[in-house]
Amino acid sequence: MNPIVKQFKYGQHTVTLETGAIARQATAAVMASMDDTTVFVSVVAKKEVKEGQDFFPLTVDYQERSYAAGKIPGGFFKREGRPSEGETLIARLIDRPIRPLFPEGFLNEIQIIATVVSVNPQISPDLVAMIGASAALALSGVPFNGPIGAARVGFINDQFVLNPTMAEQKQSRLDLVVAGTDKAVLMVESEADILTEEQMLAAVVFGHQQQQVVIEAIKELVKEAGKPRWDWVAPEPDTALINQVKVIAESRLGDAYRITEKQVRYEQIDAIKADVIAQITAENEEVSEGKIVDIFTALESQIVRGRIIAGEPRIDGRTVDTVRALDICTGVLPRTHGSAIFTRGETQALAVVTLGTERDAQILDELTGERQDTFLFHYNFPPYSVGETGRVGSPKRREIGHGRLAKRGVAAVMPSISEFPYVVRVVSEITESNGSSSMASVCGASLALMDAGVPVKSAVAGIAMGLVKEEDKFVVLSDILGDEDHLGDMDFKVAGTRTGVTALQMDIKIEGITPEIMQIALNQAKSARMHILGVMEQAIAAPRAEISEYAPRIYTMKIDPKKIKDVIGKGGATIRTLTEETGTSIDIDDDGTVKIAAIDGNAVKEVMARIEEITAEVEAGAVYTGKVTRLADFGAFVAILGNKEGLVHISQIAEERVEKVSDYLQVGQDVQVKVVEIDRQGRIRLTMKDIVSKAENADAQTDIVEE
């Protein structure tokens, strides 16, 4: 086994691509490495098309192995389970730029499996997996119009940084991944700290230029180790069947696509489709339904795209840059901490905010290390939102991806945990959908966060843009419908504030999208965003001054770090008693910061007073009210200042001689005691003799507490 290796410098890192030694029964396999982060990528492509196959069955699986980071998985089974949210997102990241590069009509099944086998905590595996998948596909010989390159772009000290390390990313105002061929950008996924449109576009162009070294290296590897190109020929179009479908459907489809209401339009289109299938199959039973549907869909695309290029009104009658009618309601759910309904045309999101304590934070045990997430964003897309029935259960890949995009859009305006000591969860329920539900989630989340009293830096709005391009003519569409997304050449989503962009996602289905076209799309998106923000600000201009009465109040206090063990108590007994008796939640940091959360403010005050008592220093000569905890032949033990136990010797219980302690004291009895001495071991000697009057005792105790 003599592997073929290609090594090249990529920014500050060294990338190695190796093939020919492992998984030789796969169609192609590549071991891709970047500075000790290694991902093994296999491609298996079936030579024969499954009978009746009418779509391209491409599957991308990305899996992280715990051994890659020298760890053993947790849990009962001690092995990796179903894909995590992070693994699902990276699988989508690999899939999105390669899917458009397979030719139309290619229906052979392909499976790509990317397995992380070694990880350097400073190098994220996602980029390595993308490069490995591109190389494996290019080597496989399947009809693939690649290879692609991939680059991560950071923005540190007003400079673009290629493939920043994990440490550098913490200082970066931008996390942008761009993928494309040698000629064109195909995909962008990014999160930004309110950068301008010009900076975002420059980052995309920078990343695309820098990744050319990857594309050239893969091409050189293919020359050495590539398998023969498949002798695949695109199926010849059935012109007779195409003309037959046109004759039956073209005029009627043209009329249907002037119906502005989605459900009515779909009913009409479904009726036309059923009629076309019935007529054609009645004449020729050998024609497959799938083939007719494909031609019918292509005809729909021609009609819609032709009208847009010709400058005619869009499907719902709008001009190219018009945003659909907006409707906003805040505070719609009485017992939640914050809520809003955002409606844009036939797309609607119900966004709900819940405030929690730090113990509600999500602990993410990733290969690159454990981290805590205090801002959670979940997106749900139930089948009723599009008038359908379907399975309801765990989130699908699309829901996870849309939720992450919406979270990226809002993250830049969220306060830090020191500014607002709450864990924040946003849930976006899509109740209606006709395009751009993820951007509706951004708008709804921004409104609900303000309704909840979360001190966000500013409002955020999102907009989805589309593109129709025919040869040299192109039209950029604002606020696309679901049909325009499906039939167009680009899905371009931008979220941001009045001053800049917070998230940008782009998926391009064709080559030839120039920076000029992207600039026009960004500028048009900015105009739409300003319009939406204006309407949102009329509904709620700033975060509410007070959080919901049903949300927990979080108060902080400082104690001496040496006293933390006293507040926690033996085996957690003291803190458990405090929380159970007062109904509060208590978290203590190593620096002595105590965070107390409760819906009832009086409960918080009680806990704070008790913690102050527990952490107070016992003073010799001071008088305290204590509780008898246990009796002995030689005296009684009394707890003062919460849980500090001292001894009242039998000779110190009363002025007269005491024969039996139980004649004078009982367990649980409250008594006045004076501190005689605190010895070197910290033991407290108490006396009940020579105690001043009760009134003076009370004054003395008050003085102690006030100090």
Curated annotation (Swiss-Prot):
Main location: cytoplasm
Keyword entries, A-Z: Cytoplasm, Magnesium, Metal-binding, Nucleotidyltransferase, RNA-binding, Transferase
Organism annotation: Actinobacillus succinogenes (strain ATCC 55618 / DSM 22257 / CCUG 43843 / 130Z)
Cofactor requirement: Mg(2+)
GO cellular component terms listed in the entry, alphabetical order: cytosol
ATP-binding found in the keyword field: no
Domain KH intervals: 552-611
Protein name (Swiss-Prot/TrEMBL): Polyribonucleotide nucleotidyltransferase
Ranges where the S1 motif domain occurs: 621-689
